[in-house]
Amino acid sequence: MKTKGYAALSAKSALVPYEFNRRSLRPRDVALDIYYAGICHSDIHQAREEWGPSIFPMVPGHEIVGKVIEIGSQASKFKVGELIGVGVFVDSCRICSSCLAGLEQYCLEGMTGTYNALERDGKTVAYGGYCDKFVIDEDYAVHVPQNLDLAGVAPLMCAGITLYPPLKNWNAGPGKKVGVMGLGGLGHMGVKFANALGAETTVFSHSPSKELDAKKMGSVS
């Protein structure tokens, strides 16, 4: 599948237009037109090789939202025309205890990153969401409600996913208290999630100017 995007050709280069081919659909794959791809600071770290050696050319982007345009012969979770989200990983071993428990992010063999990674065959480079099309196994994508602002949904695929699991793991809800350290890109989502779950939420911050915003989002203090 011919795809147009933007890539870093080296750790010192700016992003430049880049064309490449997505894989042909496997039986359980879905293909999507990308509508939005958020910019995460980790994209910059990886493109600049600040977290270790990177794979170039690199097409960054792991906060992806789009519309399904094609499905594989055995795909059943999505229909053409539905909205879909893709986050920070696109595959895992599927057989370890973590994967079997639905915790693929903790795959004992290591999950496959959305970009700057090799797919499970050990040779195919994974390209991210700074482009117009994407192909992914349906088990590693999520449904997106039709009534949401897609520009706001894209960051949920990273920042939102980062905050939600600990709240779920500790059963945040009515009768529970949640403390959020800082009210930045991650913190504000933590406040909103905890408040929506019914927990009593407190923000800890060095910036008194953020108190009003915190309370508007549902923090009690």
Question: What do these predicted ranges mean?
Answer:
Residues 146-221:
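Mid-domain Rossmann-like dinucleotide-binding core that forms the NAD(H)/NADP(H) cofactor-binding site
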Residues 3, 82, 175-176:
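Nucleotide donor/acceptor-binding cores
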Residues 12-17, 41-42:
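Short N-terminal binding/cap micro-motifs at the start of the first secondary-structure element
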Residues 42-48:
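Cytochrome P450 core scaffold surrounding the K-helix E-X-X-R motif
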Residues 21-22, 55-61, 121-126, 132:
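Short Gly/Pro-enriched turn/cap motifs at secondary-structure boundaries
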Residues 23-37, 50-100, 105, 145-147:
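Glycine-rich beta-strand-centered segment in the early N-terminal region that forms part
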